[in-house]
From Swiss-Prot:
Spans traversing the lipid bilayer: 36-56, 95-115, 131-151
GO biological process, alphabetically ordered: mitochondrial electron transport, ubiquinol to cytochrome c; photosynthetic electron transport chain
Principal location class: plastid
Gene: petD
Organism: Lotus japonicus
A molecular-function term among this protein's GO annotations: electron transporter, transferring electrons within cytochrome b6/f complex of photosystem II activity
Superkingdom of this protein's organism: Eukaryota
NCBIfam families: cytb6_f_IV (TIGR01156)
Protein family according to the UniProt entry: Belongs to the cytochrome b family. PetD subfamily.
UniProt protein name: Cytochrome b6-f complex subunit 4
InterPro entries: Cyt_b/b6_C (IPR005798), Cyt_b/b6_C_sf (IPR036150), Cyt_b6/f_cplx_suIV (IPR005870), Cytochrome_b_C_euk/bac (IPR048260)
Cellular-component GO terms for this entry: chloroplast thylakoid membrane; mitochondrion
Membrane topology listed for this record: Multi-pass membrane protein
Length: 160
């Protein structure tokens, strides 16, 4: 076991640090060598052993074998690609679809330059960033849900 050092709350240096919100690691058990040298490797090796044990004792099958001669009627990507898939599916010009996909990260990069984000952490005091986030989330959900529907209903989600 490591040496446990009790805090001296009468120490003016510690009191000054605690008043500033610092100095919480001034006392207690040191992380080196006890935690970093002995406990962390045991935890990491234990986690690896559990994963290997589960993989050996209970292997899960990935799915049914692929049949290259049977193609489904509509191929859908993974769920996190639904909005991008919907953009490519509905825009008639593929170059325009690719430009729309590139404009999303480019637009997100410009948001910090539109307003001074470093000054405030409250989202209500950053209206441009909050508006971009809310509109982007709504559009992404709209496109993601529309990608699961047939092409005729995909833009209106079958509501209109």
């Amino acid at each position: 076991m490591g040496v446990t050092k009790k805090p001296d709350l009468n120490d003016p240096v510690l009191r000054a640090k605690l008043a500033k919100g610092m100095g919480h690691n001034y006392y207690g058990e040191p992380a080196w060598p006890n935690d970093l040298l002995y406990i962390f490797p045991v935890v990491i090796l234990g986690t690896i052993a559990c994963n290997v044990g589960l993989a050996v004792l209970e292997p899960s099958m990935i799915g049914e074998p692929a049949d290259p001669f049977a193609t489904p009627l509509e191929i859908l990507p993974e769920w996190y690609f639904f909005p991008v898939f919907q953009i490519l599916r509905t825009v008639p010009n593929k170059l325009l679809g690719v430009l729309l996909m590139v404009s999303v990260p480019a637009g997100l990069v410009t948001v910090p330059f539109l307003e001074n984000v470093n000054k405030f952490q409250n989202p209500f005091r950053r209206p441009v960033a909050t508006t971009v986030f809310l509109i982007g989330t709504a559009v992404s959900l709209w496109l993601g849900i529309g990608a699961t529907l047939p092409i005729e209903k995909s833009l209106t989600l079958g509501l209109f």
